[in-house]
């Protein structure tokens, strides 16, 4: 039983990383529609994950920059919660992460910070701090 649970955990982690890589690819291709699809999968399968929070923040900011009226107010309100989740994950140790996952987390952290700073410089404040 323990071996089966271990296998499921490894499979789940790889599936989550694959989604994170998919989001990064769609972000780099600037494809908002496909980014939304990946974000929806995160919300359905890994709602509390670091990558889900980061992907959602990045997607909402990009959508807001494209057209502020496309972003419902409740999504904007949730940004500060997601940002706190990201900050919490960033305080956790990264010793157990492999090189690929560490690089992916660094990319996500960098993109979240860049996008949040850009929007805050334009007068929209996400953080509740």
Which positions does each model-derived feature cover?
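Long, contiguous interaction/recruitment modules in multidomain scaffold/adaptor proteins
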Residues: 1-10, 127-128
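Short coil/turn linker motifs that delimit alpha-helical repeat modules in TPR/alpha-solenoid proteins
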Residues: 11-12, 31, 45-48, 74, ...
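Amphipathic alpha-helical repeat scaffolds of TPR domains
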Residues: 13-24, 50-67, 99-121
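Alpha-helical segment of the N-proximal tetratricopeptide repeat
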Residues: 14-41, 45
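Charged, low-complexity interaction regions
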Residues: 32, 68-73, 94-99, 124-127
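Alpha-helical repeat scaffolds
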Residues: 37-42, 69-92, 129
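Short solvent-exposed coil/turn linkers within tandem alpha-helical repeat scaffolds
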Residues: 44-51, 89-102
């Amino acid at each position: 039983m323990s071996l089966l649970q271990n296998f499921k955990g490894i499979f789940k982690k790889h599936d989550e990383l694959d989604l994170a890589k998919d989001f990064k690819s769609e972000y780099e291709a600037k494809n908002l529609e496909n980014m939304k699809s990946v974000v929806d999968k995160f919300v359905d399968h890994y709602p509390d994950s670091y990558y889900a929070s980061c992907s959602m923040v990045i997607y909402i900011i990009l959508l807001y920059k494209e057209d502020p009226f496309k972003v419902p107010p409740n999504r904007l309100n949730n940004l500060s919660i997601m940002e706190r989740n990201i900050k919490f994950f960033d305080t956790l140790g990264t010793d157990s992460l492999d090189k690929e996952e560490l690089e992916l987390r660094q990319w996500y952290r960098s993109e979240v910070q860049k996008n949040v700073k850009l929007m805050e410089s334009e007068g929209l404040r996400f953080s509740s701090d």
